[in-house]
A protein has these predicted regions:
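ATP/NTP phosphate-donor binding region
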Residues: 1-57, 67, 102-103
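Catalytic core of DAGKc-family lipid kinases
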Residues: 5-7, 26, 36, 51, ...
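Glycine-rich beta-strand-to-loop/alpha-helix junction loops that act as flexible
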Residues: 10, 60-62, 85
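Glycine-rich nucleotide phosphate-binding loop and flanking beta-alpha elements
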Residues: 14, 64-66, 89, 133
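Active-site-proximal flexible loops/turns
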Residues: 16, 70, 91
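Short Gly/Thr/Asp-enriched flexible loops that form oxyanion-binding sites at enzyme active sites
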Residues: 65-76
Length: 163
């Protein structure tokens, strides 16, 4: 079994993405680091890593990145690690993970795992929630730049604009 692949969503930290990437390269020596360039790419990278025999795939991004990776590794015997870099980091918060990359990396290195349910809606799996209606539309229509400018408040503002 190969060890670890880290899938980084560089958009998750905006202008600080290069600094985050450098920090990950120092922390995770010996791991394979892949950065996504397009939406949906994390799922493809995760599936390929699972098929190549990697035992641990780390999502370095937000809840959207985690969701893509979960869909790539579903059905494979692979552990998911989380480095919360997104706007809300709901899944990481639900797991009680610390906010810092270094602290989360230590947890990953210690192989501390927690089983979670992997429900499925239509053809996609999800780990923390599935929304329909206003909440789903607000998440879908909140742009990357809006999230960068307003952070977690961006979703509330989008929901108010839609309603």
């Amino acid at each position: 079994v190969k060890d670890t692949v880290i899938i980084l969503n560089p958009a998750a930290r905006g202008a600080r993405a290069q600094r985050v990437r450098s920090e990950l390269e120092k922390l995770a020596r010996g791991s394979v680091l892949c950065a996504t360039a397009t939406a949906g790419e994390a799922e493809h990278l995760a599936r390929n890593a699972a098929l190549e025999g990697y035992g641990r795939i780390v999502a370095a991004g937000g809840d959207g990145t985690i969701n893509e990776i979960v869909n790539g590794i579903a059905g494979h015997d692979v552990a998911l690690g989380v480095l919360p870099l997104g706007t809300m980091n709901v899944f990481a918060t639900e797991l009680g993970l610390p906010a810092g990359i270094g602290a989360c990396w230590k947890i990953i290195q210690q192989n501390r795992t927690h089983r979670v349910d992997l429900p499925r809606a239509t053809r996609k799996h999800f780990v923390q929630l599935a929304g329909v209606g206003l909440d789903a539309q607000a998440v879908k229509e909140t742009s990357r730049s809006f999230k960068r400018n307003f952070g977690p408040l961006s979703y509330l503002i989008s929901a108010v604009q839609i309603a």
